[in-house]
Amino acid sequence: ERSRGLGDVYKRQLQWGGMEMKDMLAPKPIELPADPGAESTSDLAAGIVAHPDSPLLWALLAEQELNQQEGSEPSAFITAYAYARTGYHRSLDRLRGNGWKGWGPVPFSHEPNQGVLRAIAALGHAAKAIGEDDEYDRIRQMLSDADPESVATLLD
């Protein structure tokens, strides 16, 4: 693997008045290691017991619950919201444990990042389902800040 220089990921490109600018203070994109539960997706409950720190497994469990409750009253989404909230917090732990400072790119194209971004998106869906529109908006902005293309993939 070649080393990354200032011309690569350490600079974020901005467009301003048709002129390209580099943000020298922007953090480098986070590329997480493999999710600890990535091999345990066939039995989510057992996988979570074995890997409670897995954002991917919590995201899958929240997505499963959201899909089962589709079309239901808002109160039916409380369990999905709880699963998604847990996945969200596990995601923040995982990001911070790998150098994330609370902002900066988290590319969806890097497969190990997808569990984290899916868990965050699941919280957005669950929040919207129970009428937490402000939280949904914050989650949407968080995903857009992490990877603008992930919004279309995960929320729209």
Q: What positions do the PLM features span?
A:
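TPR repeat positional signature
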Residues: 58, 65, 116, 120-123
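N-terminal alpha-helical interaction modules that lie
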Residues: 14-101, 128-156
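Short linear capping/connector segments at secondary-structure termini
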Residues: 100-108
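Single conserved hydrophobic/aromatic residue that forms the stacking wall/gate
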Residues: 1-13
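Start-of-helix signal in alpha-solenoid helical-repeat scaffolds, especially tetratricopeptide repeats
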Residues: 55, 110-113, 117
